[in-house]
Amino acid sequence: LRVFLRVKYHQDIKALYEAWGTAFWSEVYSSFDEITLPKTAQMFMNHHQILDYRRFAASQTNDFLNEQCLLIKKYAKNQWVTTNYIPNYEEGHIGGSPALDFQSYTRYMVYGDNEGIGRRGYRVGNPLRIAFANDFFRPIQGTYGVMELQPGQVNWGSINPQPLPGAIRLWMWSVFAGGGDFICTYRYRQPLYGTEQYHYGIVGTDGTTVNTGGREYEQFMKEIRQLRGQVAASEVKPAEYFARRT
């Protein structure tokens, strides 16, 4: 953090404490060596300090992802590389690693803490969580998708309800309707042991019986094939779409 701040403020500690407003509550620093990570235990924290810390954390994360990506490509030149972002939008690193070939994110819609919308929302989830993620990731590189979509009941939530029948299919259609290019799921087969033993997969523990979520994946794949046959490969988005600005 200190190295990051020295570079950002050009070795000028006065520029830092003026930017942070540290004169209030006697937070003036005499050198960069006095600066520590923000302490959540203290009653109030300097918001400018927290902002710079988050910028530092984002920079470190992006540098690490770029390093790993370039290392893989060094030995597997034809391999595409992405990462499975958890879209917590307060974390500034999301979408900031240019070495990645495309963007992907994870989405779990029903896990007890998500109220959703309407009477059935508890088992469907809030549709805004997919809609916003689509709009967030689409402009970064153009190509994006969901690398990890909930395949059924999970085990790690405060309460773990079964998704409402049809909900998983609805999520998949929502991803593609928003411009997504692909969908993957967390696991194919539900395991017989381990921490996430009760986390569903596409098939059950016997490796052959298709779970409820797996049947919705099957249905969606049939539907998307039918739709693909009705869309000309030469079709492009209208010019008005590309002209939009937010």
Enumerate the language-model features and the residues they cover:
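Carbohydrate-binding surfaces of carbohydrate-active enzymes
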Residues: 29-38, 66, 74, 78, ...
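Polysaccharide-binding and catalytic clefts of secreted carbohydrate-active enzymes
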Residues: 1-132
